[in-house]
């Protein structure tokens, strides 16, 4: 059962829209309609605050078709959607604050490939240009990236991770998975 947190009760909004990734105005309108349906308080985002946006950047390609660079469409948040949500957040900050785009993809994913395929550096630069008083940051939250060949991890590369630091949490017997067989023991 979900209970209210320090951030309030959970809210979800679903709208039926047109698949409009190429039409920025239509996509922006659909995103704004979905956000409006949540009925956030007017002061939900204040100038000077830090907004964190966590898209789903699971993997740079569908593992069933690794050589098809378009296979990412079904497994990540579309970059046009990420761009419009980041721009919405920047507008709420009214010229001052921070927007961070970050995720922790699968350990065997290449964040460099995700950045390249989705032109995330261009997205960040565009936002910096259009919202000069807002700081935009992009980073991979993982501590390491694995190289996997034929299902076998052959190397691991340490990553800088979250510049604000990391905390290890050990739930042990408090975990919902405690007592079940598998890697979560």
Task: Show the residue positions of the predicted features.
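N-terminal and secondary-structure boundary signal
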Residues: 1-185
